[in-house]
Amino acid sequence: MSPKIIEQLAPKGVLRVAINLSNFLLVTDRSAGGNPAGVSPDMAAEVARRLGVGIEYVEYKTPGEIADDAGMDAWDIANIGAEPQRAEKIDFTRAYCEIQATYLVPPGSPLKSIEEVDRPCVRNGGCKTNT
């Protein structure tokens, strides 16, 4: 690994990884040592291994909190969804996967497909804790 890349990704000699604890698809449990466990921590550990540096998990309750700390020297890499507002402060890589999701509608709703939901004048929302 190039020393320049190591310096860019782990300038303090350890890879500080922001971990979004609210996404149960990416962080599923805790290791015996108490660290976050799951896809996101595993990917971060592999990045640290390839860089040849140690890892430090910086835990956050929401991805919004991670984004808020961008530029504050609190973390080196993170695994959160790319959004235009976040991209003003964060450089994103290509997506490594696509997470399948769906809509819930009340009984009797006339909305039967994504195309009917994803159009002007149709209001929809999400969980506030995932902002």
Task: Give the label of every model feature segment.
Residues 14-21, 37, 115-131:
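Short loop->beta-strand "edge-of-pocket" segments that line small-molecule binding or catalytic clefts
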Residues 20-24, 82-85, 97, 106-109, ...:
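Solvent-exposed coil/turn segments that connect beta secondary-structure elements
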Residues 65-67, 88, 113:
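Short acidic active-site motifs
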Residues 6, 39-40, 87-101:
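A structural signal for short loop-to-beta-strand junctions that line the ligand-binding cleft
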Residues 96, 105-124:
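Flexible hinge/capping segments at coil-to-helix
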Residues 30-33, 70, 91-95, 118:
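Short, glycine/charged-enriched secondary-structure capping and boundary segments
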Residues 16, 102-104:
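Residues embedded in well-ordered beta-strands
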